[in-house]
Swiss-Prot record:
It holds the Pfam family zf-C3HC4_2. The modification Phosphoserine is found at S38, S140, S187, S190, S229, S232, S248, S254. Gene3D superfamilies: Phosphatidylinositol 3-kinase Catalytic Subunit, Chain A, domain 1, Zinc/RING finger domain, C3HC4 (zinc finger). The lineage of its organism: Eukaryota, Metazoa, Chordata, Craniata, Vertebrata. Keywords: Chromatin regulator, Metal-binding, Nucleus, Phosphoprotein, Repressor, Transcription, Transcription regulation, Transferase, Ubl conjugation pathway, Zinc, Zinc-finger. Its EC number is 2.3.2.27. Residues 30-234 are annotated as: Necessary for transcriptional repression. Its main location: nucleus. A motif (Nuclear localization signal) lies at residues 201-204. It comes from Homo sapiens (Human). The modification Phosphothreonine is found at T24, T215, T220. The gene is RING1. PANTHER family: E3 UBIQUITIN-PROTEIN LIGASE RING1, E3 UBIQUITIN-PROTEIN LIGASE RING1 / RING 2 FAMILY MEMBER. This is E3 ubiquitin-protein ligase RING1.
Length: 406
């Protein structure tokens, strides 16, 4: 089957684009007019798109008229990409290329000494590489020094875990005779108007008169009894203070808290506790790692201490008081009658605090304001707050005497 002649002629016709139809040839400059060209635009015109360097042995594609270095375009065609690197037009082989000596002559006219130009380029590249390496080295050294300083500062500021467990509710039990040597100093430092601090739990031989705990009825912070008796100073040291070690020197920074502080309201159970003199609301501030057993032990110590203080204040003539048969306000015990020395009758034995246990009181919580839930003694206050409370106000707990303490 033969192809018509008009079809063959149509296939050989070059269809012009709209731009090609409207373009006009530029007039040649025949006089001595000079046109200034910027180095940037000149470099972009003389640069090979493959090696990004000045064209060398220029080869031009026959289809799209793009220029490349001879070695660059031949290597590109050998790699299997049979297309123009600039416009992706199909290039069958090296036959689709032609040399462009006119462009080489133009380059040699602009840059007469090609070797000098290449040597200058090499010097610039070497200098840039050296400066870049020096800057990278200096920046790396500075970054390393900065990281070392930061890690060193973190090691210095890192708190020692468990360093302040002695004065919080979660602290261990001290020896029974720790407060005997400095009774007056400790009792004076633990006055109710001293600086607040979390000290709900006290050593086994002491009380719980810390200034961070307030009561609805105005809890006492120490014993104000007879100054002439020998055991009043001991009681003041063991009951009023609560510090388990030598005092910190003035100006020394206090150790950081092991956990976040938790404020809680301690109320008597409305159904299990009868109204009495020891059923006031108590406000406690302590750390989150304190447990429910710590609260129970603190409550038992606090109530036992208050009863002991009231027993001391309620005796006729006071502890070690003078003549109680003379009558008058000075003769009835309390804080005023204890200054007479040891001439009076022998002081009766006061109730001991050694038998105080965390089993004497049970702690409850009402999450929704309804039913009360008994708290396990091993739970921490932080866990209780997250599990049962979940509101942004002080934790509210209730206490009641244990019916059958074991």
């Amino acid at each position: 089957m033969t192809t018509p002649a008009n079809a063959q002629n149509a296939s050989k016709t070059w269809e012009l684009s709209l731009y090609e139809l409207h373009r006009t040839p530029q007039e040649a400059i025949m006089d001595g007019t000079e046109i200034a060209v910027s180095p940037r635009s000149l470099h972009s015109e003389l640069m090979c798109p493959i090696c990004l360097d000045m064209l060398k042995n220029t080869m031009t594609t026959k289809e799209c008229l793009h220029r490349f270095c001879s070695d660059c375009i031949v290597t590109a065609l050998r790699s299997g990409n049979k297309e123009c690197p600039t416009c992706r037009k199909k290039l069958v082989s090296k036959r689709s290329l032609r040399p462009d000596p006119n462009f080489d002559a133009l380059i040699s006219k602009i840059y007469p000494s090609r070797e000098e130009y290449e040597a200058h380029q090499d010097r610039v590249l070497i200098r840039l590489s050296r400066l870049h390496n020096q800057q990278a080295l200096s920046s790396s050294i500075e970054e390393g020094l900065r990281m070392q300083a930061m890690h060193r500062a973190q090691r210095v500021r890192r708190p020692i875990p468990g360093s302040d467990q002695t004065t919080t509710m979660s602290g261990g039990e001290g020896e029974p005779g720790e407060g005997e040597g400095d009774g007056e100093d400790v009792s004076s430092d633990s006055a109710p108007d001293s600086a607040p601090g979390p000290a709900p739990k006290r050593p086994r031989g002491g009380g719980a008169g810390g200034s961070s705990v307030g009561t609805g009825g105005g809890g006492t912070g120490g014993v104000g009894g007879g100054a002439g008796s020998e055991d009043s100073g001991d009681r003041g040291g063991t009951l009023g203070g609560g510090t388990l070690g030598p005092p910190s020197p003035p100006g020394a920074p206090s150790p950081p808290e092991p956990g976040g502080e938790i404020e809680l309201v301690f109320r008597p159970h409305p159904l299990l506790v009868e109204k009495g003199e020891y059923c006031q609301t108590r406000y406690v501030k302590t750390t989150g790692n304190a447990t429910v057993d710590h609260l129970s032990k603190y409550l038992a110590l606090r109530i036992a201490l208050e009863r002991r203080q009231q027993q001391e204040a309620g005796e006729p003539g006071g502890p070690g008081g003078g003549a109680s048969d003379t009558g008058g306000p000075d003769g009835c015990g309390g804080e005023g009658g204890g200054a007479g020395g040891g001439d009076g009758p022998e002081e009766p034995a006061l109730p001991s605090l050694e038998g105080v246990s965390e089993k004497q009181y049970t702690i409850y919580i009402a999450p929704g304001g309804g039913a009360f839930t008994t708290l396990n003694g091993s739970l921490t206050l932080e866990l209780v707050n997250e599990k049962f409370w979940k509101v942004s106000r002080p934790l509210e707990l209730c206490y009641a005497p244990t019916k059958d303490p074991k």
